[in-house]
């Protein structure tokens, strides 16, 4: 009767008390994109809706300024 235990997801930005997400913080943004360059949805990461919108906007700005790639390395 062993049941699978799923760990509860939590929003990292809410826990830290972040007011906004900066597009220049590439290390944080890289945690929320896949290897192919797609933005990871909030149902996977557990990010709150408010911060998911800010995260999406920050990733798109960083892509536009060539701080992040639009796609993978095309190997």
Curated annotation (Swiss-Prot):
| Keyword list, A-Z | Ribonucleoprotein, Ribosomal protein, RNA-binding, rRNA-binding
Q: Which Pfam families match?
A: Ribosomal_S18
Give the family per the record. Belongs to the bacterial ribosomal protein bS18 family.
Q: Which PROSITE patterns match?
A: RIBOSOMAL_S18 (PS00057)
On whether GTP-binding is a keyword of this UniProt record, the answer is no
Q: Which InterPro entries match?
A: Ribosomal_bS18 (IPR001648), Ribosomal_bS18_CS (IPR018275), Ribosomal_bS18_sf (IPR036870)
Name its GO BP terms in alphabetical order.
translation
Quaternary structure note? Part of the 30S ribosomal subunit. Forms a tight heterodimer with protein bS6.
Q: Which NCBIfam families match?
A: S18
Top-rank lineage group of the source organism: Bacteria
Protein name in the entry: Small ribosomal subunit protein bS18
Q: Which organism is it from?
A: Colwellia psychrerythraea (strain 34H / ATCC BAA-681) (Vibrio psychroerythus)
Function per UniProt: Binds as a heterodimer with protein bS6 to the central domain of the 16S rRNA, where it helps stabilize the platform of the 30S subunit.
What gene is this protein translated from?
Answer: rpsR
> Which GO terms of the molecular function aspect are on file?
small ribosomal subunit rRNA binding; structural constituent of ribosome
Cellular component terms (Gene Ontology): cytosolic small ribosomal subunit
């Amino acid at each position: 009767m062993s049941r699978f235990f799923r760990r509860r997801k939590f929003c990292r930005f809410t826990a830290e008390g972040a007011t906004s997400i900066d597009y220049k913080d590439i290390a944080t943004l890289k945690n929320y994109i896949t290897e192919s360059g797609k933005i990871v949805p909030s149902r996977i990461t557990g990010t709150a809706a408010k911060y998911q919108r800010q995260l999406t906007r920050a990733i798109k700005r960083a892509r536009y300024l060539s701080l992040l790639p639009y796609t993978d390395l095309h190997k």
